[in-house]
Design a protein with these regions (language model features):
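Walker B catalytic acidic pair
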Residues: 257-259
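Phosphate-binding P-loop
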Residues: 16-22, 245-249, 280
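Loop/turn-to-beta-strand initiation segments
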Residues: 250-252, 283-287
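Conserved hydrophobic alpha-helix in the ABC-type ATPase nucleotide-binding domain
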Residues: 234, 271-272
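Extended helical coiled-coil dimerization/tether regions that scaffold
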Residues: 145-229, 236-245, 249
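P-loop NTPase switch/coupling surface
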Residues: 1-154, 165, 169-170
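H-loop/switch region of ABC-family ATPase nucleotide-binding domains
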Residues: 289-291
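RecA-like P-loop NTPase motor core
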Residues: 296-332
Length: 332
């Protein structure tokens, strides 16, 4: 798990130190304050788990098949840039440094340019620099990243040829857990019997989602609302990492960009409570961005296990800085 990030410079993030908790880390701030960029940095600071290091060699394969992005690197998350965008102009060497909870190791991460000198083709990656003579390596841990692609509506996806079933799935006991939690939230009962072919759905390069029928006529995975679809995707990620922990007894990380998008405020609070429970019981370190003042206020006033959650609020003037002694009155 990630304990500290010291950012020298990455885009607008400059000379910032972030001390995280093992539980829930909420990242908020006005538009353009590099909240999503911070999620990219976190994901970039871990490598994929290899099958050879696992008790159940299929555990990571299963969760990577049903979740859209696992352990994405900065170069893949920024590949949509139309031209080369230097993340730290005129800065040489270290861009940021990470310290991890599980050991005293600190890793420096630096820019590596690749491609042609033509700026239309040039790209960058950010990789650790290992000290000579030390047995250092970037920690391996499953990182599920839920970006805004998860909000794309099935009804607006016009290329049926790209839609494919996902044959690998969680064991039935975990599908039952997802279904139970989903019903608790929505009062919609998912059918998981053998007559209903319960497989995930891969919508091309867009997203992976559930594919199911329900006990209500006319309501299934293709007709539920955007918020209900978003909720299902988030629950799938949480239960996937629970499955991983119960199989391997190892920690994991969940990153969610704009958790509150499409979700009713009551869902946001209930999801926050569920994430606190899952984070504590199944060693899932959670980071999410949010613009929801009601959710932020609830988290700030949450007195139960205060050390298990933390709010970061970014201000811009002109570089991003952290609000000190954060309160909802200061934010409003």
């Amino acid at each position: 798990m990630l304990e500290i990030i010291e950012i020298k410079q990455y885009r607008k993030l400059k000379d910032i130190t972030l001390n995280f908790v093992k539980g829930i880390n909420i990242i908020s701030g006005s538009n353009g304050t590099c909240k999503s960029s911070l999620l990219y940095i976190i994901s970039n600071s871990f490598q994929k788990i290899t099958k050879n290091s696992l008790k159940n060699k299929e555990s990571v394969s299963v969760i990577s098949n049903i979740n859209k992005l696992m352990n994405p690197k900065i170069e893949s998350l920024t590949r949509g840039d139309e031209k080369y965008n230097d993340p730290a102009p005129n800065v040489k060497g270290e861009l940021y440094k990470c310290k991890y909870f599980d050991n005293d190791m600190k890793l420096d991460f630096r820019r590596h340019n690749s491609g042609k000198e033509n700026k239309e083709k040039k790209r960058f990656s950010i990789r650790p620099k290992y000290k000579k003579g030390n047995n250092e390596k970037i920690p391996a841990m499953p990182v599920i990243y839920l970006g805004l692609f998860r909000l794309f509506s099935y009804g607006e996806f016009l290329n049926d040829k790209e839609i494919k079933k996902i044959t690998k799935k969680l064991p039935k006991e975990y599908l039952d857990i997802i279904a139970k939690i989903y019903k608790d939230f929505t009062n919609i009962e998912i059918l998981l019997d053998e007559e209903n072919d319960y497989n995930g759905m891969n919508m091309g390069e867009i997203k992976k989602r559930g594919n199911f029928s329900t006990t209500y006529d006319g309501i299934d995975s293709n007709t539920i609302s955007a918020g209900e679809d978003n909720l299902y995707i988030i629950l799938t990620a949480l239960v996937s990492l629970r499955y991983y922990f119960e199989e391997e007894n190892r920690s994991s990380i969940l990153l969610i960009d704009e958790l509150d998008a499409t979700l009713h405020p009551s869902y946001q609070i209930r999801l926050y409570k569920l994430m606190k429970e899952y984070s504590k019981n199944y060693e899932i370190q959670i980071f999410f961005t949010s613009h929801s003042l009601s959710l932020i206020e609830y988290a700030l006033e949450d007195k139960e296990d205060k050390k298990d959650s933390k709010v970061f609020y970014f201000l811009e003037n002109p570089n991003v800085r952290l609000m000190e002694e954060i309160s909802i009155n200061k934010i409003e």
